[in-house]
Amino acid sequence: TIFLDTNTGFSGAVNVGIRAAKTPYVLLLNNDTEPDCHFIGEMVKAIERSPKIFSVSSKMIQMYHKDKMDDAGDMYSLLGWAYQRGVGRSSGGYSHPCRVFSACAGAAIYRREIFEKIGYFDEMHFAYLEDIDVGYRARIAGYDNVYCPHAVVYHVGSGTSGSKYNSFKVRLAARNNIYLNYKNMPFLQLLVNVLPIGAGMTVKYLFFKKRGFGADYLAGVKEGLATAGKCKKVGYRPEHLKNYLAIEWELFTGTLLYFYEFSLRQLEKRK
């Protein structure tokens, strides 16, 4: 057991554990989860399928609604929205392994040596979107993040922060969204995506304003813009051009998938 003197946030805490590990893989599991008995074995089997796999995301099912999915791997979109693939849909689905944009670090396994190449979880994030960020860096470097449907874990959700939306979470997520794009997108990619990202931020502001968190969202955006320069930006390398192009396509398809799943959830609610 490792004890820390201060609250370093999720990123700082897991980095201590990852650096202390002597194993080829590290498994992260939130304190509000309950894995099934085959979970670890299936995660190890999945990551051992290829040395190019950086992370494996598990099949996360809602703890108190076991017929519904919580997360089948994390995705990212042109709008700058990170989202849980499959959330709210039937847990009987999502039964096929596939590539995802990033593993959800609430229940994921990582290849430890790759952290040495791409960097660890960004401690400037403190919490929220740090798993998307490290998965993004892995994709830039040419590694894969995959989903394993056979590794099942039950998840409460917001077990530490206490609620789905609160001032702390909204502010940090808004700030970290700025960091995420600034760090990982070269200037040209940022320029290409500035309009959809701006549109996504506008929609999010209106969404949170309606729920009483508009000021918190704006505070996070302002903090992100003011401090993004302190982040360690991923340097552009010509040999990674094909990876950036593949990522741009993933952002496009991730946007389509978001609206497809959103539409299905709305239809299911009306039944």
What do these predicted regions represent?
Residues 26:
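Short aromatic/hydrophobic "clamp" motif used to bind/position activated sugar donors
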Residues 33-77:
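Conserved donor NDP-sugar-binding/catalytic core segment of glycosyltransferases
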Residues 190-271:
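Non-catalytic, C-terminal membrane-associated alpha-helical segments of glycosyltransferases
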